[in-house]
Every structure is written in C-alpha cells, then in structure tokens.
Amino acid sequence: MVAEGESRGGAAAEPSALDDETVFIEPRWPIALPLASYIAITIVLRIVEPERETLGPDWLVPSIEIGLLFALIAANPAHLVGRARWLRPLAITLIGLLAVVAMVANVILITDLVKGSKVTQSATSLLASGAIIWLGNALIFGLLYWELDSGGPLARYRRDRAHPDVAFSQQLDPELAPEGWRPVYVDYLILGITTSTAFSPTDVMPMSPWAKLMMAVQSLVSLTVIGLVIARAVNAFT
C-alpha cells in the first residue's frame, strides 16, 4: 500500500494534487497568542478607563474578538481540513467586523483629538489609546492578509494559485528559502506591523489591486493616528 502523501515511486505528492482530507500542519498558537493578548489588553483598558468611548455596549467588541479567536483556532487546524471548510467564511466575516470596529475606533480617537475629551487630555491615556489602536490595526490587517492572500492558508498549502496577491522575498527569490517554502501567519503579522510602521511596503510587495489598496488604507490610517497622537501627547506633556 502506498503511504499517504507519496506516489508509487516514493516521491511526495504535489500539494496541488492533495484532496480535501489533507492534513494541514500550520500551528495555531502564533495566531491565537497575539489575538488573545490583544483581547486581554482591550478588556483591561476598558475596565481601567470606563469613560473611554467605544462602539456599542462594552461586551460587543470582546464578544466578536473571542468568537474570531475560536473560529481561527477551529478553521484549518492540525487535522483533516476538509471537515472545517465552512469555518473559513466565518473567520473572514469576523475579521471584517473587527476591521470595521478598528476603523470606527480610529475615527473616534481622531474626533476626540480634534474636539478634545477627557481621555485625550491625559498624555498617558492618550498614548495608551493610540498604542492599542495602532496594535489592533497591525494585528487585524495581518489577519486579513493571511486569510485573503492566494485564497487562504489551505489554498497556499496546496498551491492552488500560480501567483500570490502579496509577494514575499522568498517567493521572488527562491534561493532565499528552503524548497517548498510558504508564508505562515507570523509572516503576515510582520507585514501588518511593518506597513503600519513604515507607511509603505518593505520586503513584501503587493501584487493584486486589493492588496495595494489595503496597504494604502493601512498606511494612511497609521500615519494619521501616529501623527495626531504624538502631536497631542507632546502638548499634554508641556
């Protein structure tokens, strides 16, 4: 009997030829850990500063975040991925909701900075708010890149698409990585952080229109938040 993942000649089967019952081995803790940490920080910040304006009731955003955490852990876990296919649309929907929440949080912060509020009068509270929003933007955009690039984690594993939506250095120059290299969540998290920090692509190039637009939006939001928060914080300290 031929072993799973091997041809009759003993060579490993190509990922594109694998069926829906293929074992997907990307670990979930690199995804769960930063998201769980972000959820904990936002909850603690809400408890410490209850006067902070948020979108909807206090339980709304944490509920969406916790739901996303469970969906991402369950979708394409380290077992038969074909059985969890329906969870990916749920994960994308929850990430989209978080992206909307993040954009609203950016608008609220910018409005508070322009009009003034109790939170923005304190340099410490202002910097904490800015840091949380910046971190949330980087994390959420990283999740979006991870779920949308080349059809998602499973499609990348199976190499269903010939051309990526975002091209990493290892894909542009195969000599920089082992044979069969594929980006995992940590690569997309770093992409989200560097785009929010450098306000432009660094070692990862957007190839498709949606990726270019998403990076442009992320850079503009990050630039606006950082610029206004730092300017207001300097005034609050002086």
Predicted regions and their residues:
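Short, Lys/Arg-rich, polar N-terminal cytosolic tail immediately upstream
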Residues: M1-F24
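Membrane-proximal soluble regions of multi-pass membrane proteins
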Residues: S150-D203
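Short, hydrophobic transmembrane alpha-helix segments
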Residues: L45-D58
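Structural signature of hydrophobic alpha-helical transmembrane segments
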Residues: G56-F70
